[in-house]
């Protein structure tokens, strides 16, 4: 979020207009190339595209998104955000290694399935259908399999969360968030 703030300020004082996707991709490039974190664009997309009283449903594969408004069936709610006092630095964590483990799993799965694949750097689990994972997961080293299982479970959780929000099931959505 600091990079988005700095970028917004630099654009404002220099009379530069960046559309939302340019803002997101420029911030991502700064994180990747200057901070040294091999992050995607989820955080930057949330910071740029989010809107009050809406859930941001984002597909980072094709950059499509949907702002799902509050459903009239929802009970009134308040969301509190606070600083826990805990700080973490992705640069000094195993984040980049975990991302490489996910790429390795995707690359292997694509190879096992005879799928066309790109370079290792451009390989993502998002490009591997769940059915391919299910068919070949036992060929993966345990660590890669666990990383892929986590990815697919989170993908499924995001889908379920968006559907619960659309229905106005805030209680179900809240339970899903805390799983």
What do these predicted regions represent?
Residues 1-72:
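Gly/Ser-rich oxyanion-binding loop with an adjacent helix/lid
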Residues 54-179:
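C-terminal nucleotide
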